[in-house]
């Protein structure tokens, strides 16, 4: 569009791109690098206009920013500063102005960036206001039921007087706080820099302080307020500091900032107290998706993501479309007031002026069931909790549609099923969509939301996957806690809240399918004449990746993770290892729990059956099925032993291992019974141990690693494995070493995608340098470490590798003479647990989980371990006194323990790099893998 008499410069300036809406072009520009944007701005007048838009430079800047950010007056200047572009002569660079161009999209965005919200407050009284409400009243009328505005809760807080923008800036100006914004990067700003930004910015969706670590960054702030008496029950509080999900936030933001439409994580409830400024709130009940919002639920892991306009854009562009009956519940929050948001409620907040607030999320007996439901495997129930019946599959949705409206009213496309993702959208679209259709359809679709939907735990649980398996279904990265932490949480609640066991059991059945696993446990106990399971023993312990139950004198583990085939190889290898250990004269025997029984539990023809199994044959329940087993496996003493397990892993390297026994996985479970160790696992004692206890632990682990690594292992018998790297056969390289190196080589093929999936805190800059750090020659050099060895008394290149010596697999017992009133002051290590992840490989591999998980990077403890380990880390006669006879420098590098260990960390199938960059925070800005190697593993070179 142009004014009368002016030419339209768009066709000439954009060429073929002129057919695209401005919104689309602006989105595409965000994918370019800053320097490319600068070049593109020189192409034409319209490109100059589009490439100088501040929202574009804001997006570019936030995608590249790392660590503390300092705003330089505009986002373009800030981005150029980050890019290292000097702007000394910027004063003479005046902006160009062009006629013949108009964009409604850019104008609306400009309006949103500069509009004032002085008269934007709203309160029609549809959120109740209460003062001096009792806990009993709150529980009966509001808790997990409906929002309420509460006054008087913060009257006695020091924060009511001291949490102003100026006072906070004066006291905490140098403290960096985390910033909320739409890029995945974690960005912080010193408070003084943030306030400077806040006062000068003209952003549509301004950055705002949203810091869940403010109590650690500025501990004095925690003394300025207290949790109101209505919200002091928080069941997540029993988790230790590292496992507890984020639960409290300091919120500081300017006019126009605020949280767009969302449902709080894990369906928790929340309270939010405003200390200064004014906030406009809008809320919808559970299942009622706001207009313009799209809910994505991934069918693979149930991960939920939400596409939503900014708060300001929603109120300006979408709110006017709503009929009165479809408008949200609204209020304006004033200083000193607290709003309570129940579980599952949609809410959106817009700051009408600079504000300071504090908020906390919590779990109590009223919303506990919903929290458990949200962490249950599957995806249907997650969609229904947030989007109501609109989240159902197409065929179910159509049935419900017919009950609520005629076919010709099909104006609101709310269901779009793709292969990987179910999307539920209340349309409103972009700047160019037809809003008339939306106006006609919204009310009718909201009527459909009401029909039959209930935010009731029993109703919502009916949408759970009937075949759900907590131990095998993918775990959503969006869940508030990890799988083990969630099981540990339920286990702790079971012990600490016996009066709530009926509710906790219901939640455990929803999240874990606990009733199913309890039935399996009872069948195993009955077969082996073990005591009946008591009320205290009904839930599996939180640690481990399989259901493990601790009875009075027994520990029972059901193998389910990864499906039946993986479970059979896990138990089969463990039983083979115990057989070898039993015939060896090794002191390791006394530090591994005694095996009392093992077998297979299966459900057949309506009843459970149990058969013993010692690992030395293929059980009938499997051999009688339609599975083909080759002669080598049938003739193996342990058909599911280490080398058959290794062959399976070798065949499936780089892709998820299929479960060949999949048809049996849902009703066949291997198990093992061991004698229960007295005491506690190290994970439960970590914070209570003395330094002397920790040194004793390091001494113990050094001894037991030595014992494990000296234990003989079976020779490679599988012909397929013997042919691995046959091209190097003339070098007389031990077969097991060839197998190990080949597995590493396979892992490198998808290492970049694996690291990208893990994401933060792994620096993205280092991901591009993996090939430089681990060239393909690395694997050839690693093979050659053991060339021309003649057997004899040569130290073997490989050993048994436990693979999982972590804080939950080390058992501690109290010193018998060291207790006061039953409280023990000192603990000593007694046992190493769980040998189901055994492999054979480089002994250095066992140091990785110990140093990172058990020792948390404590170099003194690693030194203590190595002192008592006493075996060479470089097991080759080509290495003497830390040097090599080979002149090749790359071969020398491979022989370096620090380099080799760093390579193993990068290629590891578990996210050990995440642990490294969490322990050594300063390495997140590392520019090379060599820097990481020297910081973390250089100690090994002096051993």
UniProtKB/Swiss-Prot annotation:
Its main location: nucleus. Its EC number is 1.14.11.-. Fe cation binds at residues 262, 264, 347. Residues 216-379 form the JmjC domain. InterPro entries: Aminoglycoside_PTrfase, Cupin_8, F-box-like_dom_sf, F-box_dom, JmjC_dom, JMJD6_ArgDemeth/LysHydrox, Kinase-like_dom_sf. SUPFAM superfamilies: Clavaminate synthase-like (SSF51197), F-box domain (SSF81383), Protein kinase-like (PK-like) (SSF56112). Mostly expressed in leaves, and, to a lower extent, in inflorescences, roots, siliques and stems. Residues 396-410 have a biased composition (Acidic residues). One of its GO terms (molecular function) is metal ion binding. It comes from the Eukaryota. It is found in: Nucleus. Residues 396-438 are annotated as: Disordered. Its cofactor is Fe(2+). Transmembrane segments: none annotated. SMART domains: JmjC. Binds 1 Fe(2+) ion per subunit. Keywords: Iron, Metal-binding, Nucleus, Oxidoreductase. One of its GO terms (cellular component) is nucleus. Residues 14-60 form the F-box domain. It is an enzyme of class 1 (oxidoreductase). Belongs to the JARID1 histone demethylase family. May function as histone H3 lysine demethylase and be involved in regulation of gene expression. This is Lysine-specific demethylase JMJ21. It comes from Arabidopsis thaliana (Mouse-ear cress). The lineage of its organism: Eukaryota, Viridiplantae, Streptophyta, Embryophyta, Tracheophyta. The gene is JMJ21.
């Amino acid at each position: 569009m142009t004014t009368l008499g002016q030419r339209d410069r768009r066709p000439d300036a954009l060429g073929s791109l002129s057919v695209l809406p401005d919104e689309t072009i602006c989105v595409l520009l965000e994918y370019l690098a800053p320097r490319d944007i600068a070049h593109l701005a020189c192409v034409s007048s319209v490109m100059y206009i589009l490439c100088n838009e501040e929202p574009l430079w804001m997006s570019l800047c936030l995608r590249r920013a790392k660590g503390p950010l300092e705003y330089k007056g505009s986002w373009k200047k800030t981005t150029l500063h980050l890019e290292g572009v000097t702007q000394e002569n910027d004063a003479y660079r005046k902006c160009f102005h062009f006629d013949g161009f108009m964009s409604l999209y850019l104008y609306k965005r400009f309006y949103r960036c500069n509009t004032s919200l002085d008269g934007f407050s709203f309160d029609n009284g549809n959120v109740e206001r209460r003062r001096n409400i009792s806990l009993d009243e709150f529980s009966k009328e509001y808790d997990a039921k409906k929002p309420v505005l509460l006054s008087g809760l913060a009257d006695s807080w020091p924060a009511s007087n001291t949490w102003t923008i100026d006072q906070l800036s004066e006291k905490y100006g140098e403290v960096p706080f985390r910033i909320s914004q739409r890029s995945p990067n974690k960005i912080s700003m010193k408070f003084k820099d943030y306030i400077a930004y806040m006062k000068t910015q003209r952003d549509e969706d301004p950055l705002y302080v949203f810091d869940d670590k403010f109590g650690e960054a500025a501990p004095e702030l925690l003394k300025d307020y207290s949790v109101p008496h209505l919200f002091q029950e928080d069941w997540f509080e029993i988790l230790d500091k590292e496992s507890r999900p984020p639960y409290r936030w300091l919120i500081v933001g300017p006019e126009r900032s605020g949280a767009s439409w969302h449902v709080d994580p894990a369906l928790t409830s929340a309270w939010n107290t405003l200390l200064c400024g004014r906030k406009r709130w809008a809320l919808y009940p559970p299942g009622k998706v706001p207009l313009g919002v799209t809910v994505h639920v991934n069918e693979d892991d149930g991960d939920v993501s939400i596409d939503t306009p900014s708060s300001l854009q929603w109120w300006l562009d979408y709110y006017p479309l709503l009929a009165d009956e479809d408008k949200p519940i609204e209020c304006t929050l004033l200083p000193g007031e607290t709003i309570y948001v129940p579980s599952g409620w949609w809410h959106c907040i817009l700051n009408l002026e600079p504000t300071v607030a504090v908020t906390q999320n919590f779990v109590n007996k009223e919303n506990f069931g919903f929290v458990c439901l949200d962490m249950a495997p599957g995806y249907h129930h997650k969609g229904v909790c947030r989007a109501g019946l609109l989240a159902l599959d197409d065929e179910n949705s159509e049935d419900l549609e017919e009950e609520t409206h005629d076919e010709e009213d099909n104006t609101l496309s709310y269901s779009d099923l793709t292969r990987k993702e179910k999307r539920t959208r209340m349309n409103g679209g972009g700047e160019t969509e037809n809003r008339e259709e939306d106006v006609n359809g919204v009310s009718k679709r909201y009527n459909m939301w009401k029909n039959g939907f209930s935010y009731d735990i029993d109703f919502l649980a009916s949408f759970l996957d009937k075949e759900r398996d907590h131990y095998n279904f993918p775990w959503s990265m969006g869940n508030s806690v990890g799988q083990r932490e969630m099981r540990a949480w339920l286990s702790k609640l079971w012990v600490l809240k016996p009066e709530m066991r009926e509710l906790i059991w219901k939640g455990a059945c929803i999240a874990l399918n606990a009733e199913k696993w309890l039935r399996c446990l009872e069948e195993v106990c009955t077969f082996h004449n073990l005591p009946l399971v008591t009320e205290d023993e009904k839930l599996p312990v939180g640690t481990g990746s399989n259901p493990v139950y601790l009875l009075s004198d027994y520990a029972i583990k059901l193998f389910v993770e990864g499906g039946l085939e993986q479970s059979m190889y896990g138990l089969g290898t463990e039983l083979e290892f115990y057989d070898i250990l039993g015939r060896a004269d090794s002191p390791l025997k006394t530090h591994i729990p005694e095996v009392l029984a093992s077998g297979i539990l299966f459900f057949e023809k309506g009843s459970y059956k149990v058969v013993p199994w010692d690992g030395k044959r293929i059980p009938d329940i499997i051999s009688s099925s339609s599975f083909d087993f080759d002669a080598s496996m049938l003739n193996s003493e342990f058909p599911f032993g280490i080398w058959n397990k290794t062959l399976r892993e070798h065949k499936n390297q780089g892709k998820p291992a299929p479960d060949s026994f999949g048809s049996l996985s849902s009703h066949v479970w291997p198990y093992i019974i061991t004698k229960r160790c007295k005491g506690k696992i190290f994970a439960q004692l970590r914070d209570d141990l003395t330094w002397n206890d920790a040194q004793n632990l390091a001494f113990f682990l050094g001894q037991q690693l030595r014992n494990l690594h000296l234990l003989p292992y079976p020779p490679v018998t599988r012909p397929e494995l013997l042919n691995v790297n046959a091209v190097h056969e003339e070098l007389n390289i031990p077969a097991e070493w060839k197998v190990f190196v080949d597995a590493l080589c396979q892992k490198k093929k998808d290492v970049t995608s694996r690291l990208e999936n893990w994401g933060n805190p792994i620096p993205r800059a280092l991901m591009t340098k993996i090939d430089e750090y681990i060239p393909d020659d690395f694997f050839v050099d690693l093979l050659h470490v053991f060339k021309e060895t003649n057997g004899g008394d040569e130290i073997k290149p490989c050993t048994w590798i436990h693979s999982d010596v972590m804080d939950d697999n080390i058992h501690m017992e109290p010193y018998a003479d060291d207790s006061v009133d039953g409280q023990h002051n000192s603990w000593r290590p007694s046992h190493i647990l769980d040998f189901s992840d055994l492999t054979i490989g480089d002994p250095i591999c066992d140091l990785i989980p110990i140093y990172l998980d058990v020792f948390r990077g404590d170099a003194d403890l690693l030194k203590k371990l190595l002192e008592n380990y006493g075996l060479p880390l470089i097991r080759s006669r080509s290495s003497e006194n830390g040097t090599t006879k080979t002149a090749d420098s790359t071969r020398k590098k491979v022989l370096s323990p620090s380099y080799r260990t760093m390579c193993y960390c990068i290629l590891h199938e578990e996210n050990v790099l995440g642990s490294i960059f969490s322990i050594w925070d300063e390495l997140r800005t590392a520019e090379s893998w060599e820097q990481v190697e020297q910081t973390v593993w250089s100690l090994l070179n002096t051993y």
